Amino acid sequence: MSGPALRLALEIDGDGAHPAAWRRAVHSPDQLLSPRRVASVAAAAENAGFTLLTLDDGVLPPGVGPDVVGRIGAVERAAFIAASTSVVGIAPVVPLTYAEPFHVSSQLASLDHISVGRAGWVVSEETRPESASVWGRPVVDGAAARARESSGGVEVVRELWDSWEDDAVIRSVATSRYLDRDRLHYVDFTGDTYTVKGPAIVPRPPQGQLVVLGSPDRVPGDQLDVALVAGRDLAAVTASASAAGTPRTFAEVEVALDTADATAEERVADLERHAPWSDRGRLRHIGSAAGLAALLGELRGVVDGVRLHPLVLDEDLPELSRLVLPPLFERRYAVRPLPGASLRTHLGLDRPANRYAAAAAQEDAR
């Protein structure tokens, strides 16, 4: 299908999408969380031409048994990656089921400042009841209750990002004033499990509002910039994208590619001996690089981008960099991000006006 060029995102948490991916990694297990490892994966993805990197997270181990994966917090890793990259966007997963929106807004606004406007946020949720005890909070039980927490949390975070107008920081030596207090605004929100009073403690992010990504099944589409849509086939993805109601849509695609040493099927079978690759209802390509390029070509016009979940980063990322992305760029099926641009610009999203400044301008115009 023809359509605008795709934007490409890559999930880089752990050693890959498969829970036993570490068994085929080229590094020793104790190097997974090393600064060199984190920086090298990010650099390889940026050099390949990905527009966005995402980093999964959670307060509990993702599984039990011998294939439990350790991780450093996604926001901390994202901040580290921001300092060692210059073009690619970075979006950590931050669940809102139990986290305080005030602290989430501060962390993510800080990330946007550190990255000079390249930050995003993948909204997620904590589904396991054990997570509540980590936060010292009552269990949020049921999908509807978790959705309310996410929806209310996103609303508050967005309002906090706007609680500082763009020119609130004046740094006037002549008047000894650092802030224009009239351009700071009081947020007054009362939810079921928390309240937020007052402005943020971090100035408005460079992008105004970070790019917010998430599943429209969990967060209302009008609160998202990018819907992450799933489906086991092209028809299902098309239906999900059409129903998302968001400015942009990205298809979720799990990937296992043929390599010089083994076919994709052999690689998957090797890992399946240790743990199953869970079915998350996503498109899944197991096969050649050419086949993946063809699939992504079919997604043009259906979605605005794709987020790839490689089976094993150390094996699949080199194949993506060498055999998949170059022909996509050559045919203009996908585009590289441009130096000096924000993540919103890369995704074709306008920088939003500050809600308080816009309201004041409307009042003055009357």
Task: Identify the meaning behind each predicted range.
Residues 11-31, 100-183, 236:
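Flexible, glycine-rich active-site loops centered on histidine and acidic residues
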Residues 52-72, 231-236, 308-321:
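Glycine-rich, proline-tolerant flexible connector loops at the mouths of alpha/beta enzymes
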Residues 133-144, 152-159, 237-244, 313-337:
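C-terminal helical cap(s) of enzyme catalytic domains, especially alpha/beta-barrels
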Residues 6-12, 53-55, 88-94, 117-124, ...:
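Hydrophobic faces of well-ordered beta-strands that scaffold small-molecule active sites
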Residues 45, 49, 81, 111, ...:
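Conserved, mostly hydrophobic/aromatic
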Residues 2, 43-47, 78-86, 112-116, ...:
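Acidic (Asp/Glu)-rich catalytic clusters
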Residues 1-84, 209-210, 224-226, 341, ...:
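N-terminal beta1-alpha1-beta2 module of alpha/beta enzyme domains
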